[in-house]
Design a protein with these regions (language model features):
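Proline-aspartate-enriched helix->loop->beta-strand connector
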Residues: 15-16, 61, 65-70, 78, ...
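Conserved Rossmann-fold cofactor-binding substructure of NAD(P)-dependent oxidoreductases
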Residues: 47-68, 250
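Strand-loop microenvironment adjacent to phosphate/nucleotide-handling motifs in alpha/beta enzyme folds
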Residues: 135-156, 160-320
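Hydrophobic/small residue at the entry helix of a nucleotide-binding pocket
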Residues: 2
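Helix N-cap at the beta1-alpha1 junction of Rossmann-like dinucleotide-binding domains, i.e.
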Residues: 24-27
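Aromatic pocket-lining residues of Rossmann-like dinucleotide-binding sites
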Residues: 6-13
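Conserved residues in the N-terminal Rossmann fold of short-chain dehydrogenase/reductase
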Residues: 47-48, 90, 181, 244
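Conserved Rossmann-fold NAD(P)-dependent oxidoreductase catalytic core, especially the SDR/UDP-sugar
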Residues: 71-134, 139-141
Length: 320
């Protein structure tokens, strides 16, 4: 969702060339057709590849030498990653390292990682892997001349697998609409708004920053369900039941934008702040990452312990 919108907004700026790399051919085909329909003169190249394939990734960077890289590829579904935690490490952590390294090795000017507020004091493996990705970006910024930054934000409205399409489907099917906890809250932003801010944050980059987007006031998910039922012309808990199902493994009642050690610096845009980066020991990080990959690929129980060593604020959910 974010990747597609990035392509839409970048294509309007008439880039010298826009290269889309995706592992899913159907998604890639859909956005390719949409972009060319709207802008037939766009110099667009669509490549099918996995971020886990370091040779393929390096070959792409060596051949096309992109100047600006937006890295949005990630497994993002919290409960699914709790049951497949090793896949979160292989795709999110290993994939980010391989793409970030290829960018630096091949002289990219700027690398922007799409991160999440779930990286802050994570209670789930998805958030913990995204925090490690932020650490990788900070370490890479010291290793190469490329300016590496991360942009951290919350949920986007209507994205694949998000709550609004789910509620809409549940209402269409006659209910119940399922909410995990009556008091659970989340930050929301529209996809175009989030991407517009990501592009602006990328323009502010000097290297090593974690940009934090102002998502406004948090929304209570129960209220969202209640209002969506009313907007459908139905009465909540009469025509359509709102069912409380209990927090899922790795799920928090609320998300945080910053860790305790981080402070906020303002930018020219009041919607974008810079989180004061926590220092990263690059040697320790890269050594631990090697151990982590071995455990993830061997699917051992030790993998989560290594994630906790890298991200001490990660609280392992014993239910998952």
């Amino acid at each position: 969702s974010i990747g597609s919108e990035l392509c839409r907004q970048i294509s309007k700026q008439q880039p010298k060339q826009l290269i889309i790399v995706d592992i899913y051919e159907n998604n890639a085909y859909d956005i390719q057709q949409e972009l060319l329909r709207k802008n037939p003169s766009l110099n667009l190249l669509v490549l099918i590849a996995s971020v886990r394939d370091s040779k393929k990734v390096n070959d792409i960077f060596a051949k096309y030498k992109p100047e600006i890289v937006f890295h949005a590829a990630a497994h993002k579904h919290v409960p699914l990653m709790e049951t497949s935690p090793n896949e979160a490490v292989k795709n999110n952590v290993s994939g980010t390292l391989k793409v970030a390294d290829a960018a630096g090795r091949n002289g990219a000017k700027r690398f922007i990682l799409i991160s999440t507020d779930k990286a802050v004091n994570p209670t789930n493996i998805m958030g913990a892997t995204k925090r490690i990705c932020e650490m990788i970006i900070q370490a890479m910024d010291k290793k190469y001349d490329t300016d590496y930054v991360a942009v951290r934000f919350g949920n986007v409205l209507g994205s694949n697998g998000s709550v609004i399409p789910l509620f809409r489907k549940q209402i269409e099917e006659g209910g119940p609409v399922t909410v995990t906890h009556k008091d659970i809250v989340r930050y929301f932003m529209t996809i175009p708004e989030a991407v517009s801010l990501v592009l602006q944050a990328g323009a502010y980059a000097k290297g090593g920053e974690i940009f934090v987007l102002d998502m406004g006031e948090p929304v209570r998910i129960y209220d969202l369900a209640f209002n969506m039922i009313k907007l459908s012309g139905l009465t909540p808990n009469k025509d359509i039941e709102i069912k409380i199902t209990g927090l899922r493994p790795g799920e928090k009642l609320y998300e945080e934008r910053l860790m305790e050690e981080e402070g906020l610096q303002k930018t020219a845009n009041e919607m974008i702040s810079i989180g004061k980066p926590i220092s990263v020991d690059e040697k320790y990080l890269f050594e631990k990452l090697q151990e982590l990959y071995v455990e993830a690929y061997n699917e051992t129980e030790k993998m989560k312990e290594l994630v906790h060593e890298l991200v001490p604020t990660y609280k392992i959910d014993k239910r998952s």
